[in-house]
Amino acid sequence: MKFSRKLAAVTASAAMLLSACSGSATPAPAASGGGAGASGVTAAGCTVGVSWNNYQEERWAKWDEPAIKKAVEAAGGKYVANDAKSSAETQATNVENLISQGAKVLLILAQDDKAIKPSVATAISNGVPVVAYDRLIEDPGVFYVTFDNVEVGRMQAREIFKAVPKGNYVFIKGNKADANAVFLKSGQDEIIKDAVASGDIKNVGETFTDSWKPELAQTEMEQFLTANNNKVDAVLSENDGMAGGVVAALHGQALDGKVPVSGQDGDAAALNRVALGTQTVDVWKDSRELGKAAGEAAIQLCNNKDVTKIAGASSFTTPGNNKVSSILLKPQPITKANLNVVLDATWITKDKLCAGVTAGSVGGC
């Protein structure tokens, strides 16, 4: 069946599916703006459709979406969005719905980078450019906007290795269907591979975590603690949500604050854990900058559908040996030593950062 016929069939239901995005948070309503964006490119009347994989995660609603929406509307574009609620099948349908609503460019935060490929290929073949947002989609026709996730992994491992150069390590990885989980682990491995080879570091537990769920990470960590009689010296957790689950498991054995734990994303709870000493490092990725870059790239694609012509883009070689045009932003590790960075950037308030922290015990609190 041709894509245009499928779109006709779902047009009438698109609005209902959007309104069905229930839960504590839903994507912001569509709105139109006017004028030129920060990139100097205008796209009056261009609709940018965003497919979120799971809008319930803190950062998407708080940081990423407002930045994308602002960039799109500043250039005169219109923003529409929907939420797949961690379902790859729903996301495929959502992509069709966005196009049926008139989206001229798509931003997709993929739930499953392989499952979404047919929808992406069909969109591109129908003249709708696709931006892979923060998660790689293995298609040379997409434009990829993210942080350097291999470097995120390196940053995590550097801080944990600094704290524990020898000992038993556990690796809590993200969703198996998400290329970022692989990128992060490869960066971590670069830092600790010699210590692993020499036997200084022993891998006593490693697992992927479905949909990066904190509650699953907690269960996984509890199982690794049991299997190793609590003899775990360090945990490389790939993100903050899972780090929260890890710390909860450690707390159950009175090990929180004693076993170094990594994370990333700059979640408020994680930054507070850094201040408290129960999380060693949180690699901060300023999602406001990521959203801005993606929104501006989408606006440029409204005017010129060639993904190789995006300002500031470079070529990125994927694990599948495809070359995609991309923008990779630089992350920053946050530890007790530089908490002032996120305060100065107004990323978090002092009250939230320092909750439960003894005044003067760490910088910024």
Segment roles from a protein language model:
Residues 2-6, 12-16, 21-365:
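A residue-level marker of the well-folded mature domains of exported/periplasmic proteins
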